[in-house]
From Swiss-Prot:
SUPFAM superfamilies: Anticodon-binding domain of a subclass of class I aminoacyl-tRNA synthetases, Methionyl-tRNA synthetase (MetRS), Zn-domain, Nucleic acid-binding proteins, Nucleotidylyl transferase. The keyword Repeat does not apply. Pfam families: Anticodon_3, tRNA-synt_1g, tRNA_bind. Belongs to the class-I aminoacyl-tRNA synthetase family. MetG type 1 subfamily. Its cofactor is Zn(2+). HAMAP family: Met_tRNA_synth_type1 (MF_00098). It comes from Shewanella pealeana (strain ATCC 700345 / ANG-SQ1). This is Methionine--tRNA ligase.
Amino acid sequence: MANSQRKILVTSALPYANGPIHLGHMLEYIQTDIWSRFQKLRGHECHYICADDAHGTPIMLKAQQLGMTPEDMIAQVQKEHEKDFADFNIQFDNFHSTHSDENRELASEIYIKLRDAGYIKTKTISQLFDPEKSMFLPDRFVKGTCPRCKSEDQYGDNCDNCGATYSTTDLIDPKSAVSGATPVMKDTEHFFFDLPSFEGMLKEWINSGSLQQEMANKLGEWFEQGLQQWDISRDAPYFGFEIPDAPGKFFYVWLDAPIGYMGSFKNLCNKRDDLNFDDFWSKDSTAEVYHFIGKDIVYFHSLFWPAMLEGAGLRKPTSVYAHGYVTVNGAKMSKSKGTFIKARTYLDNLDPEYLRYYYAAKLSSRIDDLDLNLEDFAQRVNSDLVGKLVNLASRTAGFISKRFDGKLAKIADTSLTESFLAKQETIANFYETREFGKAMREVMTLADIANAYVADSAPWQLIKDDAKQEEAHQVCTNALNLFRILVTYLKPVLPKLAQDVEAFLQMELTWDNLDVDLAGHEIAKFKALMQRVEMKSIEAIIEASKENLQVTAEPEVKKQDKTPLEQDPISEEISFEDFAKIDLRIARIAKAEHVKEANKLLRLELDLGGETKQVFAGIKSAYAPEDLEGKLTVMVANLAPRQMRFGVSEGMVLAAGPGGKDLWIMEPHEGAQPGMKVK
């Protein structure tokens, strides 16, 4: 039991109820589930809450296409979502829907409190209207050119390329995504939440440590641009909750979606006598509330949501934790390549615990994107889980059953066990701070030590010598005890494996019984706990995920971007003498790390084969630091040092691409050596 029991409410972002869960979504639910399970393992009161996000124009239109009512469609999708989550061993304490009585009541109650406090304004606006469909177009159903960076094919409310947020009417050359028609302007009265009134409070909350530093920095940029009043209403036809005393006007989905966290918890409280809603959501609540989200919805969760709660006299989240996107094999998930993988497709072919472990092994507290490299995935699972972890039990358990009646020995030398137990708080701290990758590395380092102990002791040899039976008994018992400790450390990540090990060891694995004396304890006969990942299973997933290339090719051609040469024409000619001044050298990236308070930069230490230079490179959006270390690249070695806010940059690395994720550093072929001149 933890020294002081905490009361914790934790949420994941609500999956949208118009389609299936895919492996990009699963990153967040696995991350949150691991953290929630860890809190429970430590003895804390922790409630993991989620719901389907079931409102909005996309759901209304999708239901029309399917010939269903929106209510029937979201009910069907919710069943599919719940099945996928359950099969991935996601342990929600409650999974509900935003289309619920609890959510309707809470949304109306919060709105009325905001209205009565003077935080709701009304004004007539000009909005884009689809003349063919006779409907006002929500932000996501208008596409055009970003008014800031001029990127084409961007949504009506924000730009995926530069991150700008703007009014739909600011979009250049807008088109209706519903009909393709050019929308017309039409006046309508809308309701606005007075977000600027909360600027001071938000700045204080953001700088209190409630957000990751990268998030706080990004929000600082939005404050510089100035907070705007937030449009919280939509016109009929719309699937959602009608605004009180405003016929034909509905709450925008992003108003009632985060309230869905509260609605789901309210639903849980209604089912149980031992839970009180106000204990977690009242202004003076001492409980902890944590939201795990993707980096694409930071704006809503870190500005609108806490401001709404403050205005309604409710408590704000303790923290909001954002994560990055999932790429597959180093690229954006692709339906044509078969890397846009649905959760169900994965589950039809592979053990969910494999993906839980792989994601955990690569997750940190930062907002970096995570690459699901399928070859590395197979190798890591086979090496770590099968080759190291399960191998400990498979090499020793049989001897206990066959030679010692399934009973464990009294361990004479407990030094190895004590060294494993000494890592308990280190690993706990890694879980608590969401440094799951560090926790996995710590556990696998211990697994290496345990396997080395078994290899050096060679119980399969000892067992052949009648005089060494007790020693063999000691070694096998010690190995199984170390195995028990390791599986307990991994229990939040691998709950099904832990359950199977509990059946095998005939005891519950808890954080509090790690140091229990197992002398004389009887275990069950060992059964295989985990199979190796076969590449044919991965290939089957890819094939099952591919869509017909001819179907996807045509729309891609229609919206094809300009060629790189058209986007960035060749510069004016320079003389050979000017070019000769540039000293290009091969360099090895000896170290790469994030730069605190910098959104785009990585600090690189470049080895030139006898000299080291420090370079600040704007490649953070495309590379994780650990993926760069050891690589060869090309740098401008004689660039004059430049004093930056973070230190002196002594050169420049060469990279190609338009920016964002689409950046590629120059990597010379094998044979090039640090210090070589590029001619």
